[in-house]
């Protein structure tokens, strides 16, 4: 069975409440439940995790590196700041997909730089919640090629 880890970074626990004009009206629990059901139908195990703490995200990437086939991450605000999370990905060498609900390149100037895009397998940005489905499909396809 394919094991996929979904990590959501800071403030994504506020989905549905935080700036719905940018991030939509679904909450994180709804998104995760839909993805878990989809993954199960495709014979995959999807584990979901959200944290506002950079160190917890780094710890999780390290801890799950041996049991995870691919990681999907929405790093939230850490996209533009976290060398520590970037270094964790480089250290464990687990393929990962970077995802953003909004198009980070169509927003404020400081949001246009990602510390992850150049080391990610791929980046999905600007498709709203559908981006999570696209990332899950891409992760499953990536694993089937191994």
Tell where the protein language model's regions lie, with residue ranges:
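Extreme N-terminal starter segment of soluble prokaryotic enzymes
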Residues: 1-4
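Short Gly/Thr/Asp-enriched flexible loops that form oxyanion-binding sites at enzyme active sites
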Residues: 63, 82-91
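Short, glycine-/small-residue-rich phosphate/pyrophosphate-handling segment
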Residues: 47-48, 106-146
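Glycine- and acidic-residue-enriched helix-capping/strand-helix junction motifs
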Residues: 15-29
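Short beta->alpha junction loops
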Residues: 45-55
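Short, acidic/small-residue loops that bind anionic groups at enzyme active sites
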Residues: 91-107
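Short acidic/histidine-rich motifs immediately flanking catalytic phosphotransfer sites
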Residues: 64-71
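Short glycine-rich anion-binding loops that position phosphate/pyrophosphate groups of nucleotides
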Residues: 10-12, 76-79, 102-104
């Amino acid at each position: 069975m394919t094991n996929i880890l979904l990590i959501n970074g800071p403030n994504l626990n506020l989905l549905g409440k935080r700036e719905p004009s940018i991030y939509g009206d679904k909450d994180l629990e709804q998104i995760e439940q839909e993805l878990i059901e989809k993954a199960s139908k495709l014979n995959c195990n999807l584990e979901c995790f959200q944290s506002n703490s950079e160190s917890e995200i780094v710890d999780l990437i390290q801890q799950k590196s041996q049991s995870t086939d691919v990681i999907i991450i929405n790093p939230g605000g850490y996209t533009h700041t976290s060398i520590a999370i970037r270094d964790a990905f480089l250290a464990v060498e687990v393929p990962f997909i970077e995802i953003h609900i909004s198009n980070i390149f169509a927003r404020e100037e400081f949001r246009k730089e990602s510390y992850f895009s150049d080391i990610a397998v791929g980046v999905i940005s600007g498709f709203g919640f559908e981006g999570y489905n696209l990332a899950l499909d891409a992760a499953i396809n990536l694993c089937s090629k191994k």
